[in-house]
């Protein structure tokens, strides 16, 4: 019985930690992406929690599912048109979190190399100034 319990607990830990990334006080939570077709673009959304006493910077991202990955900020201009601007640095203050969400910051997956269907998962590596690279698992979901 103890072997079954230990195996179950180990499996549970693996499942929980595969859904988020954590390195040196930086936790990446709730990562998801929109469905998309090969050749189109998609976006990744997530929350980054900086548990350290120093500010951190997200400086890049990459994934094998797309030709490129860029950090973008969506915003509404004075004419009411949505625009996107590439971001070279996103600051996560010490002991704080930022959310990459629809209509704001996000990771743009440029030119998908394959279809992304609801339920699929794929890795994305986030590049941080201090923590280095953190690879997370992203689930494809329909936006609410």
Segments (PLM) and residue ranges:
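Residue-level signal for mature regions of secreted extracellular proteins and peptides
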Residues: 10-13
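C-terminal motif of bacterial Sec signal peptides marking the signal peptidase cleavage site
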Residues: 16-19
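Compact, glycine-rich, soluble single-domain proteins
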Residues: 23-144
């Amino acid at each position: 019985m103890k072997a079954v319990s230990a195996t179950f607990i180990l499996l549970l830990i693996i499942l929980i930690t595969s859904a988020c990334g954590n390195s040196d006080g930086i936790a990446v939570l709730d990562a998801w992406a929109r469905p998309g077709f090969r050749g189109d673009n998609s976006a990744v959304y997530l929350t980054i929690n900086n548990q350290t006493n120093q500010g951190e910077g997200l400086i890049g991202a990459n994934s094998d599912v797309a030709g490129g990955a860029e950090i973008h900020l969506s915003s509404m201009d004075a004419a009411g048109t949505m625009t996107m601007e590439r971001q070279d640095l996103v600051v996560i203050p010490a002991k704080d979190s930022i959310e990459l969400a629809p209509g704001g910051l996000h990771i743009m997956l440029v030119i998908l190399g394959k279809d992304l269907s609801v339920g699929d998962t794929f890795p994305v590596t986030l590049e941080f100034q201090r923590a280095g690279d953190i690879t997370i698992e992203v689930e494809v979901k329909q936006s609410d």
